[in-house]
């Protein structure tokens, strides 16, 4: 069984794939490296689903043959049993291939291949919330290192008792946004703070925002909307005082976004960094507006919802992490050490299944082929 919409789409993709193959064999196209590369990339993006479709068609033919053998094997119990097993195996294979093809046909998020800025803000809980924000900075840094991604601290606001009031990490590598976009939301922790003498469990939160890297073309910023001031990076006194005003305090009047950037060595570099962060924040606002429109049709999007969405609770007493979107529990210690790949893969799978259900609900009645 395969849905009509799926077969129509697969036939169209296969036709496009074959046309691209012919164009790549054209000597005139080969003379234009830019055009050749563009066509090769387009063909490569279709290769997985086309190969799967070819395998599916072959399995359909094998299934028809096996059913014919089963039909003709009247009185031959051994042949009937062999044919029956083959039919069952092929039906299971076809079901698996259909699911693979559906997933391969799902629209890709255009931001999936982008680098990101990961912002962590301390939420409710006072000093403990800032310490918790610091723990999350460490967790994501460890995970990024495990993925062979490059991590750098773009901006920070240190808390008096340790940790961060706010921190922004820049993470660069392969498919960063495609994975970490599921981490956006409120992360709640339940534990006894180091500042708690009575041993009582406190609940604190930190908010994570995932902002895909953007350039000037994607986000327009009117310079009239920006107020810029400078300060010394080292603070009020001590050995680390920078006597030159290299720190940049940027304020975006329409949105109220304020960015204080001190990480770079020169005022110009800090200004560029602050503008880079502002572009990412404005782009994130635009994405959230788009997602709000989608959510009126679709109840929610896993992990890419609003910042107010509580996505996970970290319970120290029970050594348990509960992901509220998945309704699943995970061991606390490995996650805090950056081993969050299993959680992220579970979110990706859930997201795919939800989109497949929507696709099926909006499509035609299944037909037999």
From Swiss-Prot:
This is Peptide chain release factor 1. The modification N5-methylglutamine is found at residue 239. It is found in: Cytoplasm. Its main location: cytoplasm. Keywords: Cytoplasm, Methylation, Protein biosynthesis. HAMAP family: Rel_fac_1. SMART domains: PCRF (SM00937). GO terms for molecular function: translation release factor activity, codon specific. Gene3D superfamilies: 3.30.160.20, 3.30.70.1660, 6.10.140.1950. SUPFAM superfamilies: Release factor. The keyword Protein biosynthesis applies. Peptide chain release factor 1 directs the termination of translation in response to the peptide chain termination codons UAG and UAA. The keyword Methyltransferase does not apply. PANTHER family: LD18447P, PEPTIDE CHAIN RELEASE FACTOR APG3, CHLOROPLASTIC. GO terms for cellular component: cytoplasm. Belongs to the prokaryotic/mitochondrial release factor family. Methylated by PrmC. Methylation increases the termination efficiency of RF1. NCBIfam families: prfA, PRK00591.1. It comes from Trichodesmium erythraeum (strain IMS101).
